[in-house]
């Protein structure tokens, strides 16, 4: 364990496949360093694999291909409520929609 105080860190991507294949090692390293890691993505078959590794994965109400304004507002509202409840120290979005919406919601939540 490092001498850095533990933080809650959110990793947000547009697929659970992406988190599993490209950010799994980061999530595990952060967790093993004492941080609380929350993974967010739309539902998929890899969410269960992430949980099986002992990681916390939450299914986000996101359609990565949609531009429906109501769906996008629903996602922003969901993220805002989640960030207010969880109070993460850091939100890191890996794809454009996740980076933009995650940043907007994090800012509004005071992250």
Task: Give residue spans per PLM region.
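Short His-centered aromatic/hydrophobic patch
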Residues: 93-99
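Active-site proximal beta-strand in glycosyltransferases
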Residues: 7-10, 106-111
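N-terminal strand-loop element at the rim of the active site
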Residues: 8-70
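Alpha-helical elements of Rossmann-like donor-binding domains used by nucleotide-donor carbohydrate transfer enzymes
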Residues: 25, 74-81, 101
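Structural motif
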Residues: 8, 89-90
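Short beta-strand scaffold positions
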Residues: 41, 92-93
């Amino acid at each position: 364990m490092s001498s850095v105080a533990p933080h809650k860190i959110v990793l947000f991507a547009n697929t659970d496949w992406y988190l599993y294949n490209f950010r799994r090692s980061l999530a595990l390293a952060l967790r093993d360093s004492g941080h609380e890691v929350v993974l967010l993505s739309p539902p998929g078959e890899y969410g269960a694999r992430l949980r099986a590794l002992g990681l916390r994965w939450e299914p986000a109400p996101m359609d990565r291909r949609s531009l429906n304004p109501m769906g996008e507002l629903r996602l922003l509202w969901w993220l805002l409520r989640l960030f207010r409840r969880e109070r993460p120290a850091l939100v890191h979005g890996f794809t454009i929609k996740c980076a933009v919406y995650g940043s907007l919601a994090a800012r509004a939540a005071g992250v």
